[in-house]
């Protein structure tokens, strides 16, 4: 797996999912050259979606993409049985792969993680993207565990690494041939320079073309050209994480008149000071 895969937001309208807005956002990304989308992930506010909404969003994403780009469906859970059910649903409706976050809150051991992902891998045939984000889950998927899973299961092909420690990421890349996608926009270029393959991105929701260009340059070894875009994007990327994701990206999309709508509690509107910083970054980039 290689390239740019925006983690799409879930637009809301009148308390429900705005499916027309969702389609509009996906088509915008397809038209701007992304390699695929990630549906109902962290950026899509998956924790506050009902199971029915979760499934309908995946179905809509598959329908809109229609084979033009890949759909990576969020299917993770801190319950192995629930993750299996969500993964099987995603496969049944035509998703190209599933994104599986490490179980959160219950803090499994590395052996528990091996057994969790093994059970899911044995239950489906489509590719699996492991998702390591210790800042949210309180558990780190160790390089040795990733290596074991990659070598044991042919459908575990990729890991989204949102651990910002480049030493950890280097160990992962050096341990096996699993595809590594950065889970941090700001670290995309460094991760590719270490041997990574791309990114699951937040900023690409609003500047997909530029981000795709940067990643393409990097994957072609044109790091001078990639660096120029990286630094052009840098302040904008940082501004999208001054509060919890997806609060800033949805705020930015609303400011840019893109379908986004409200946030679902417990997420709420940005503090005015931070919103001003975000608006400034959007203006400096030329989006406002």
Swiss-Prot record:
Sorted alphabetically, which Gene3D superfamilies does this protein's record hold?
Aldolase class I
List the InterPro entries: Aldolase_TIM, DapA, DapA-like, Schiff_base-form_aldolases_CS
Residues noted as binding pyruvate in the record, renumbered to the chain: 43, 200
The record's listing under CDD domains reads: DHDPS
- What molecular function terms (GO) are annotated for this protein? 2-dehydro-3-deoxy-phosphogluconate aldolase activity; 4-hydroxy-tetrahydrodipicolinate synthase activity
Per the UniProt entry, the Enzyme Commission number(s) are 4.3.3.7
Q: Name one GO biological process term.
A: lysine biosynthetic process via diaminopimelate
Q: Which SUPFAM superfamilies match?
A: Aldolase
Part of a proton relay during catalysis (site feature) positions: 42, 105
The UniProt function text for this chain reads:
Catalyzes the condensation of (S)-aspartate-beta-semialdehyde [(S)-ASA] and pyruvate to 4-hydroxy-tetrahydrodipicolinate (HTPA).
Q: How does it assemble?
A: Homotetramer; dimer of dimers.
List the NCBIfam families: dapA
Full protein name: 4-hydroxy-tetrahydrodipicolinate synthase
